[in-house]
């Protein structure tokens, strides 16, 4: 999941008519939405395959992809039936100011959490990590050996100071289609190379048959633990806060529905291929951040080069998306704290007062949290499921503008029940597992 938001969710004014002459392209809309979907979530998909098995994982990807497309349609239909051009505006029409604040806060949690996840993965790539007593070397250790300056702390510090800081100091984010295209193509490069490596390993007989279904050997806890993998896939399909900014840059906002459908199908295919081939390639040794698996040595220099390209290309992809998330987070936080102030671009003091604490907090979070799986479980079972399913379903059932059909209300009811039930089970299981681990 890379949720690149291009505009504050609570704008102070409607888009000016002068901007109507410069409409966004359909291809740009597809790239922007696809980049919003394919973020760090793809890194945890193979681990979900390991937990759930191949067939349940593929089934859940298809179901969540379909539900995500449907819920995005709910949002646009509600928006066009009313007068709102933002997600928060639609929530405000349905549930008042509290609804707008709720979706803004949840979006901030998702974007900040995603920034931490991105930073953790980048740290894994450049400086390595230790998992279950096994040390996974980063690119810097492989190239230059282990030194104090390429440890995780100093590696991330260098990235934050000399790369992220200059980028997040940019005050305007415009015309994201080109950067989104580059980011998406880098993600696609990762999928292609990992698929080729898996096929080569399969031909050479170096792979084991993947589990088609989960193994339930530990009783009820293992069964309920399956629900902790589903939120990871939900997080990977959360893009709904970017639908409105993309839609209202198009000549016809309804075209975003076709762009969304294409993006969801494309990303579901990419997720399925990534999960299947990476799980086939690494089997039960698949890590929660699959990039860490690509640090293993190979018998050829070509294999080692491909491993490095896989990790480096995706790390660069995340680096390109990171400033977009920061821009959205900062804009929404400013709108929440200072709704009556002048534009953030025109207020240096407020701009720096928000930028530096957010960046420092993200850096500290990436150092303190060693594993992206915990963050994916938390975000997927709380914030992202609210943005992707609970809020859109509630808008349809509320039906303030009278646009909902009986069929849509039935689908929304099922969506709401599934989302809430899965979240409760996932949260309860995570708490139980964490408590049991602490006791042992």
From Swiss-Prot:
Biological-process GO terms, alphabetical: amino acid transport
Keyword check for Membrane: yes
GO CC annotations on file: organelle membrane; plant-type vacuole
Domain of life: Eukaryota
The entry's keywords: Amino-acid transport, Membrane, Transmembrane, Transmembrane helix, Transport
Protein location: Membrane
Membrane topology: Multi-pass membrane protein
Membrane-traversing stretches: 26-46, 47-67, 102-122, 149-169, 182-202, 219-239, 262-282, 309-329, 356-376, 377-397, 410-430
Keyword Ligase: no
Pfam families linked to this entry: Aa_trans (PF01490)
Family to which the UniProt record says this protein belongs: Belongs to the amino acid/polyamine transporter 2 family. Amino acid/auxin permease (AAAP) (TC 2.A.18.6) subfamily.
Name recorded for this polypeptide: Amino acid transporter AVT6D
UniProt source species: Arabidopsis thaliana
Biological classification of the source: Eukaryota, Viridiplantae, Streptophyta, Embryophyta, Tracheophyta
């Amino acid at each position: 999941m890379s949720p690149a938001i291009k505009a504050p969710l609570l704008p102070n004014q409607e888009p000016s008519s002068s901007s109507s002459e410069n409409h966004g392209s359909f291809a740009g809309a597809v790239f922007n939405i696809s980049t919003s979907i394919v973020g760090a979530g793809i890194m945890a998909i193979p681990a979900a395959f390991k937990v759930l098995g191949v067939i349940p994982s593929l089934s859940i990807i298809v179901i969540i992809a379909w539900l995500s497309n449907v819920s995005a349609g709910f949002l646009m239909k509600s928006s066009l039936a009313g007068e709102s051009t933002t997600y928060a505006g639609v929530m405000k029409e349905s549930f008042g100011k509290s609804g707008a604040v709720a979706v803004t806060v949840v979006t901030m949690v998702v974007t900040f959490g995603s920034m931490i996840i991105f930073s953790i993965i980048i740290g894994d790539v450049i400086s390595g990590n230790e998992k279950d007593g096994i040390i996974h070397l980063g690119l810097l250790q492989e190239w230059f050996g282990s030194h104090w300056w390429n440890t995780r702390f100093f590696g991330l510090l260098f990235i934050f100071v000399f790369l992220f800081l200059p980028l997040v100091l940019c005050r305007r984010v415009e015309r994201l289609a080109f950067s989104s295209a580059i980011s998406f193509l880098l993600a696609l490069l990762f999928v292609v190379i990992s698929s080729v490596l898996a096929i080569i390993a399969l031909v050479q007989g170096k792979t084991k048959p993947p589990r088609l279904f989960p193994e339930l050997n530990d009783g009820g806890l293992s069964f309920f633990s399956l629900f902790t993998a589903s939120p990871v896939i939900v997080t990977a399909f959360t893009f709904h806060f970017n639908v409105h900014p993309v839609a209202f840059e198009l000549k016809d906002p309804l075209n975003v529905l076709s762009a969304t459908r294409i993006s969801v199908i494309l990303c579901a295919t990419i997720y399925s291929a990534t999960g299947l081939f990476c799980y086939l390639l690494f089997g039960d040794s698949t890590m929660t951040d699959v990039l860490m698996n690509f640090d293993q040595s190979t018998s050829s220099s070509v294999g080692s080069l491909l491993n490095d390209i896989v990790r480096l290309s995706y790390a660069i992809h995340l680096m390109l998306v990171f400033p977009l998330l920061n821009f959205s987070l900062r804009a929404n936080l400013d709108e929440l704290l200072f709704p009556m102030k002048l534009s953030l671009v025109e207020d240096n003091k407020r701009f720096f007062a928000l930028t530096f604490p957010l960046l420092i907090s993200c850096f500290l979070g990436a150092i303190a949290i060693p594993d992206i799986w915990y963050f994916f479980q938390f975000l997927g079972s709380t914030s992202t499921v609210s943005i992707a399913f609970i809020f859109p379903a509630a808008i349809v059932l509320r039906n303030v503008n009278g646009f909902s059909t009986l069929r849509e209300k039935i689908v929304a009811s099922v969506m709401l029940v599934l989302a809430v039930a899965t979240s409760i089970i996932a949260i309860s299981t995570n708490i139980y597992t964490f408590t049991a681990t602490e006791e042992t």
